[in-house]
């Protein structure tokens, strides 16, 4: 008769195997075996560990999986605990519509994932009903739209940089101060004429330079572009309220960049009688640097005394040259 070997410390020990049930099946078994078809979370843990030794000796990581399935699956319903009963934690029970989710009562096979139809309609229905009136009120044609009646608060189109020239400065003046504008059609050059009687300038009228003519007074060629000629500082336009005499306004015509020969300009500059009390001319009327000498006829008529704003006379340079139709200072 052979003796069987005694089990020693080196003999292999049998480890419990994992049961072939899903976590949903384990929770359903624990709930159905509990009194009242409801169990707390700790009661579900005790049932699983008491029936399956694998979960009793295994690490407690499976408990997190139990809580995860209780929260995500709609077949488990959380019922609050009654305040009159001792204990803590809510109860978990099965939804009445999911008792047949296992085929033939076997927890090994589950029919399909349970979806609570009534709860889904109850939760989604009010949301759609709330969205409906909001969409209807926003698209109601009877309600005036606040954005359509709002006027544009931005200023109109700004003038181009060309408007900063002398011509644009005159155009920016009010209608009461703006002189009569000329059309943009080119005009033939005016021939110099000798007229004995000057044409008096009204206080509200100011000379306007034509942009189409060249600038022979400064020796510019006829092809000199308008943009290059207007890059200089523009001559300030004086308002009629400034009290400037008519003779001084006519003298300002000689300082414009592009001008035709005024018939009465020569006679006005030849007169030695100054204006009674004109204001101080602006600083931009100072004499520029002398230009290269040309075949010109010097005309010395003495300085033009202009009464300054502080009461002292202000004289212009006496070096005034004359060409066959132009006058300018050097």
Swiss-Prot record:
GO terms for molecular function: DNA binding; DNA-binding transcription factor activity; DNA-binding transcription factor activity, RNA polymerase II-specific; DNA-binding transcription repressor activity, RNA polymerase II-specific; RNA polymerase II cis-regulatory region sequence-specific DNA binding. It is found in: Nucleus. It comes from the Eukaryota. Residues 184-196 have a biased composition (Basic and acidic residues). GO terms for biological process: anatomical structure morphogenesis; blood vessel development; cell differentiation; negative regulation of DNA-binding transcription factor activity; negative regulation of DNA-templated transcription; neuromuscular process controlling balance; positive regulation of multicellular organism growth; regulation of transcription by RNA polymerase II. CDD domains: FH_FOXS1. GO terms for cellular component: chromatin; nucleus. The keyword Nucleus applies. Transcriptional repressor that suppresses transcription from the FASLG, FOXO3 and FOXO4 promoters. May have a role in the organization of the testicular vasculature. This is Forkhead box protein S1. The gene is FOXS1.
């Amino acid at each position: 008769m052979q003796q069987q070997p005694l089990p020693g410390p080196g003999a292999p020990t049998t480890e419990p195997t994992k049961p072939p049930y899903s976590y949903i099946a384990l929770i359903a078994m624990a709930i159905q075996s509990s009194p009242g078809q409801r169990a707390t979370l700790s009661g579900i843990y005790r049932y699983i560990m008491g029936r399956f030794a694998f979960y009793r000796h295994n690490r407690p990581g499976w408990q997190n999986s139990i809580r995860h399935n209780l929260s995500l699956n709609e077949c488990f319903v959380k019922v609050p605990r009654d305040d009159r009963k001792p204990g803590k934690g809510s109860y978990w029970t099965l939804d009445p519509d999911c008792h047949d989710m296992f085929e033939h009562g076997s927890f090994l096979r589950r029919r399909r994932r349970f979806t609570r139809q009534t709860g889904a309609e109850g939760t989604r229905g009010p949301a759609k009903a709330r969205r409906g009136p909001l969409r209807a009120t926003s698209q109601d044609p009877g309600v005036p739209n606040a954005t359509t009646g709002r006027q544009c608060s931005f200023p109109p189109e700004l003038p181009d940089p060309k408007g900063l020239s002398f011509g644009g400065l005159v155009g920016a003046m009010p209608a009461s101060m703006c002189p009569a504008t000329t059309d943009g059609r080119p005009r033939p050059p005016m021939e110099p004429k000798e007229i004995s009687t000057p044409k008096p300038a009204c206080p509200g009228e100011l000379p306007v330079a034509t942009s189409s003519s060249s600038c022979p007074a400064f020796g510019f060629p006829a092809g000199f572009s308008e943009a290059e000629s207007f890059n200089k500082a523009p001559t300030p336009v004086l308002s009629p309220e400034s009290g400037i005499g008519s003779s001084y306004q006519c003298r300002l015509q000689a300082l414009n960049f592009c001008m035709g020969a005024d018939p009465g300009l020569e006679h006005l500059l030849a007169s030695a009688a100054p204006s009674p009390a004109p204001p101080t001319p602006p600083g931009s009327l100072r004499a520029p640097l002398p230009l290269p000498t040309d075949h010109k006829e010097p005309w010395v008529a003495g300085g033009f005394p202009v009464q300054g704003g502080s009461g002292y006379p202000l004289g212009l340079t006496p070096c005034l040259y004359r060409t066959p139709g132009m006058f300018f200072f050097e």
